[in-house]
A protein has these predicted regions:
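Cytosolic catalytic headpiece
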Residues: 9-185
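Juxtamembrane helix-loop transition segments at the membrane interface in multi-pass membrane proteins
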Residues: 1-11
Length: 185
């Protein structure tokens, strides 16, 4: 185990590990590189790309989620302004929201958009296209509707496939743990 970078304290745990039949693996950072990038932005309703990046990065800068960090990196590459955010709130399993200037903006997943009545066929199609290609999505919305859908890609590590095959060969069934929807996963 130590040759693989694992520290397991106590022989009992090593002995018990040989009885494993299932293992849960987190996707981000375990099976993927854990450094998602913005692969595309679908602008909706005539939204301005730089303004969308500014709003999304302003919210993202308040959050430690890897997708937020990717949006902040993209905004910095495009020299979009990161603005102060007031009343920032993390919405577990949904996204984040806060007040920027005089308006409220949110970064939300599709379920959260549906829950708030903000989704549309166009928004759902953007999310579905991303998930069909194995990518994640997050939408930027204001009080009037969805401004953009960010498509995020996180590269699979080079040794992931062989590692999963080795687990299966040992009779261990790997399970994927992720916040993504099933198709993206």
């Amino acid at each position: 185990a130590t040759r693989c970078g694992l520290l397991i304290k106590g022989g009992l745990f090593l002995e018990e590990a040989r009885k494993l039949t299932n293992i849960g693996l987190d996707k981000t950072g375990t099976l993927t590189k854990g450094e998602p990038e913005v692969a595309g932005i679908t602008l909706l309703g005539g939204a301005d790309r730089k303004q969308v990046l500014s709003l999304a990065a302003s919210l993202g800068a308040m959050n430690k989620h890897p997708l937020s960090a990717a949006i902040v990196r993209e905004a910095k590459k495009e020299h979009a302004e990161i603005q102060p955010v007031a009343d920032f709130t993390a919405l577990p399993g949904e996204g984040v929201t806060g007040r920027i200037g005089t308006g409220r903006a949110s970064l939300l997943n599709l379920a959260a958009l549906d829950k708030r009545g903000l989704s549309s066929d166009e928004v759902a199609d953007a999310f579905n296209r991303a998930s069909e290609n194995g990518m994640s999505s997050v939408a930027l919305a204001d009080t009037f509707g969805v401004l953009a859908v960010f498509v995020m890609a996180d590269e699979i590590k080079a040794d992931t496939r062989s590692g999963l095959a080795q687990l299966k060969a040992e009779g261990i069934t790997p399970w994927l743990l992720t916040g993504d929807n099933e198709r993206a996963a």
